[in-house]
């Protein structure tokens, strides 16, 4: 690790992946490792050779891979103007364990990040997945302000409709906080 960049050297077994899974594997690797404190980017090697394309593709990659690459991407674009890229953390539950899954959404929007995050947490990200958000579609963000790196959000009373306070405190707060990070 040098200047926030972690260098990893893999053997050729990493190339044993289907072409259409290659990018997703790399995105997950980048997102997982840059979540660790002090790691801002990755440089990847395969048996001491710099990785210049996604495995089993011709798609070029930058020398230093960062979270700018996105993860689990959804595209909602109708032009190349005013494109925003926001990563929203949705919830997935398996048995009694709750996971927070990042989804990078690329869309045409002039809204700020807070408005985009709340808007997307009020909707379901994928029609056919187990990703959820406990933020109700009827919830309205009344007001927000940022003071000294702290975000204060005021919601309509509908925020608590049909949800236990425990679920509200944990899942909604964590999803919003991770998404605004």
Question: What label would you give each PLM region?
Answer:
Residues 1-181:
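Bimodal "functional hotspot" detector
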